[in-house]
Each structure stands twice: as structure tokens, then as C-alpha cells.
């Protein structure tokens, strides 16, 4: 049965939760059926992977920033910035996930007759009880891909062809021994109400820059030039020898670009200082 609509709430007392949802009908008829999940706390880490139905190859870890405002305040967004690798994704965490999560996921889908080929995004939470899976996505993460793929040494087309052909085990997936940070430039007011159609200046600064990238999202080409056309407008990514240098470079590059209602968080990568 398809679930067409979902609503959620966090409740300390389970009886109060049942009464609020099923008796008081806080969510109307949507509350006739409930799914009760464990409430978890910890750092969230994103791990992308390639899968060919049997073999899974893990990419570098990344850490996203979902809230719209500095200090993780405001509404949830599609992601306001990210960095890779995550210093909290340790060798111990990696070994646990490889043993209990990654290959087990691929094997379980194959056993159900749902052999999967493509990208699996693992949304993990590092709890006191160990890594837990929060979500799966059958796609690259945005903006996670903007800090993971620039560090990948392999040809992306060759890797994707190996996923299709079932020869991923022959691919030696390699990543640069450095770091990358992405800062999203958004339209002020995102993710609620915002204006668009403003001319974007400074994009030419990225031409010929090996360690700097400008990824387009909410943009549109017009006769006057490229203008804003969405909430998240651009992803500004920079690489560095370590996370602190990459963060410094990324924020420097955000100053190359301007448009009338430009907005960004100023604390992307704040967890780097806590590692």
C-alpha cells in the first residue's frame, strides 16, 4: 500500500503520542495509522556508493548542513553546504558499516529479487550505540556529490558502465588525499518565499581554476545573461590540502559571485573545529 502523505512529531511519552495522534486527531485521518520509530541523537554522516547488483564500492564520506540559518537554526532545506571527508567517519565506523550495513543492504535486495544497480546514498547517524541507518536514497546527494566527486580520481563514466555491466569488482575506486567544502548560495528567504530573476555576476572567475568549482542549481539562461531561478542557486566548491584550507578557499570563492538577494550560511564546516 502506498503512503501518500506523512506527518511526524517527537513525543517523550508514548501514551501521550497515541492519544494526540489517534484520539485527538492532530493530523486528521492520517493519524489512523502510525509508525513508531526510535528517537536517535548523534552526528549525521552521508556515505555515497556505487553498486552493480553484487559488488558495492564506497565513496568518500561527507557531512551536510540541513538548516537554513547559522548555528543550525531555521527551517530544514535541501542542504546549505557540506564537506568531505567527515573527520567523524573513523576507520572503526567504516569497518562496522562495511561488516553490517553496506554489503548486507546489497545482498538483501538481491535475495528479495530486487537486484540494484546504481547509486546508494547511506544517511547515517553516529549514535552512542554505534552507526545507525537513517535513510537510503537511490541517487547522489545534493550537495554531497559536489564535494565527493571532485575528489574522485576515476572516470565517472567508466565507473557507471561497470555498475551496468556487473564488473564493478574490477574497478579500483580512488580518491584524492585532500578535502573539499561546498557553500550553497541561495535566494534570501529560501526555503519559504524568495524572489528570482536576478542577474548573476562573477561566474567567469571560475574559468581555468583547477581547485574551484561553481555548480549551477536554481539558474536560468536569458538573453541578458544567467539569472537566479530557484531557492538554492549555486554550489561553490573548493578543494584544499585539509578541511580548514578547503573551507577558507570555498568562502573566498563565494565572494567572486554576486546577485541581488544572495544568501548563505557563514558556518559551513563548523564541526571541523570540533573534530
What are these regions (language model features)?
Residues 16-21, 37, 44-73, 122-123, ...:
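Beta-strand scaffold of nucleotide-dependent catalytic cores
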Residues 1-11:
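Single conserved hydrophobic/aromatic residue that forms the stacking wall/gate
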Residues 12-46, 103-112:
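Conserved ATP-binding module of the ATP-grasp superfamily
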Residues 51-55, 126-130, 222-223, 239:
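Short acidic-glycine loop/turn motifs at beta-strand connectors
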Residues 49, 56-101, 137-151:
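ATP-dependent carboxylate/phosphate-activation module, predominantly the ATP-grasp catalytic core
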Residues 219-223, 227-275:
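Generic C-terminus detector
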Residues 98-120, 137-211, 221:
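Active-site "cap" helix and flanking loop/linker of ATP-utilizing ligase/carboxylase catalytic domains
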Amino acid at each position: 500500500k502506498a503512503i501518500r502523505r506523512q506527518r511526524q512529531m517527537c513525543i517523550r511519552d508514548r501514551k501521550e503520542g497515541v492519544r494526540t495522534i489517534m484520539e485527538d486527531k492532530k493530523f486528521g485521518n492520517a493519524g489512523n495509522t502510525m509508525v513508531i520509530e526510535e528517537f536517535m541523537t548523534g552526528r549525521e554522516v552521508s556515505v555515497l556508493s556505487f553498486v552493480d547488483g553484487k559488488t558495492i564500492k564506497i565513496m568518500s564520506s561527507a557531512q551536510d548542513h540541513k538548516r537554513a540559518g547559522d548555528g543550525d537554526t531555521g527551517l530544514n532545506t535541501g542542504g546549505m553546504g557540506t564537506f568531505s571527508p567527515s573527520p567523524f567517519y573513523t576507520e572503526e565506523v567504516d569497518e562496522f558499516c562495511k561488516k553490517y550495513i553496506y554489503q548486507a543492504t546489497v545482498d538483501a535486495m538481491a535475495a528479495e529479487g530486487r537486484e540494484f544497480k546504481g547509486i546508494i546514498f547511506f544517511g547515517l547517524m553516529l549514535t552512542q550505540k554505534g552507526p545507525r541507518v537513517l535513510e537510503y536514497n537511490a541517487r547522489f546527494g545534493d550537495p554531497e556529490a559536489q564535494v565527493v566527486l571532485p575528489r574522485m580520481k576515476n572516470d565517472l563514466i567508466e565507473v557507471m558502465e561497470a555498475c551496468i555491466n556487473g564488473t564493478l569488482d574490477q574497478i579500483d575506486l580512488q580518491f584524492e588525499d585532500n578535502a573539499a567544502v561546498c557553500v550553497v548560495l541561495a535566494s534570501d528567504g529560501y526555503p519559504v518565499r524568495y524572489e528570482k530573476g536576478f542577474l548573476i555576476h562573477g561566474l567567469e572567475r571560475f574559468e581555468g581554476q583547477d581547485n574551484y568549482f561553481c555548480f549551477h542549481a536554481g539558474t536560468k539562461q536569458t538573453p541578458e545573461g544567467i539569472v537566479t531561478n530557484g531557492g538554492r542557486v549555486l554550489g561553490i566548491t573548493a578543494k584544499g590540502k585539509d578541511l580548514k584550507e578547503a573551507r577558507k578557499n570555498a568562502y573566498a570563492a563565494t565572494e567572486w559571485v554576486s546577485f541581488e538577494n544572495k544568501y548563505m550560511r557563514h558556518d559551513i564546516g563548523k564541526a571541523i573545529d570540533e573534530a
